[in-house]
UniProtKB/Swiss-Prot annotation:
Swiss-Prot/TrEMBL catalytic activity: N(6)-[(R)-S(8)-aminomethyldihydrolipoyl]-L-lysyl-[protein] + (6S)-5,6,7,8-tetrahydrofolate = N(6)-[(R)-dihydrolipoyl]-L-lysyl-[protein] + (6R)-5,10-methylene-5,6,7,8-tetrahydrofolate + NH4(+)
Stored NCBIfam families: gcvT, PRK00389.1
Protein name: Aminomethyltransferase
Family as reported in the entry's similarity comment: Belongs to the GcvT family.
Any one of the GO BP annotations: glycine decarboxylation via glycine cleavage system
Family annotation (InterPro entries): GCS_T, GCS_T_bac, GCST_C, GCV_T_N, GcvT/YgfZ/DmdA, GcvT/YgfZ_C, TrmE/GcvT_dom1
GO cellular component terms given for this protein: cytosol; glycine cleavage complex
Record function comment: The glycine cleavage system catalyzes the degradation of glycine.
Amino acid sequence: MDLLKSPLYSKYIESNAKLINFAGWEMPISFSGLINEHESVRTSAGFFDISHMGVISLRGINPKEYIQKFFPTNLYSFSEGQGLYTLILNEKGGIIDDLIIYDLGRQEGDISEIFLIVNASRYQDDFLWIKNNLNTNQVSVSNAKTDKVLLSIQGRNSFTLFEEWIGSSISHIPYFGCEYKNFDHISTEGKFFFSKTGYTGENGLEILLPAQSAINLWDFLVSRNIQPCGLGARDTLRLEAGMHLYGQDLDEKTTPYEAGLGWLVNLENNHEFFGRDFLEKQSKLGIKKKLVGLTIEGRAIGRKGCEVFKDEKYIGIITSGTWSPTTEKAIAFAYIQNSYAALNNVVEVLIRGKKFKATITKRAFYKKDI
């Protein structure tokens, strides 16, 4: 099967990127090397092509009324020009996807628009789940990314760089805020969408824009000596920041409470959503497994599938693991039996036939300086 390619694919080739198959897309794993790319984001700025991710548009008169049932979070808790991290759940409270939902406000007359930026591997599942269960013709569902690029600039200098490129300030936009507007002095190809969000633990922007404009933005960033970054650095950055990766840390057999995302579930509001009955019971009965952070002694890295033990007893399994360039420690996420999940509890991780001591920590291993 032919792999999908971003409109920026030619830039990968020019930059001698190392390419891999990721969720059916041919994507860069690295450009100049994972450590250099990681440190560029932590110390100044770096940028990522994230066009493999999906963007779903929901349009209608008050679309929140019709789509609320897909999300455990109260959609009326955020308003036009804002984004919200949330989940799509199945009937048993399992996580179909984690995503950010954006309220773009009115676009044409009384028609409002919502954007969902979803994981690459889950786009088709998300799209069909919503379309097949919407049960109304009052809201249209479509792909908002056709022939466009999703580019992410991350790091403490990201806002300044973007302001220089567009020629105006974005200081009025709050964290998780967004805008959807024309920049006619840059492009006449259509509106740009951008938000103050990211997947690195740093200040950052995610920008949906026409292909030629994305090429121009790439060239501008390179001219400012900003490092293009691949999926390798994106993974180490997100794990340091304590952020989940769907397919490793989240899946349809795992609930928000087990994943440490119970704060996204609003049971106080009366709105119905898929999985509510199951989650109400689980919130009362408790969970059997829990996602925790681990710091592993030495330099051995606990990768996905490594088993976790306590006093020779198997208690869980690692879902994500890496060497942290920032903390200079081996870090990981693991699902373990809840009775062993207390902070600072010392466990053992089996790595290539040898056990290494590990300490249970909070999942965020890094927090940026304010």
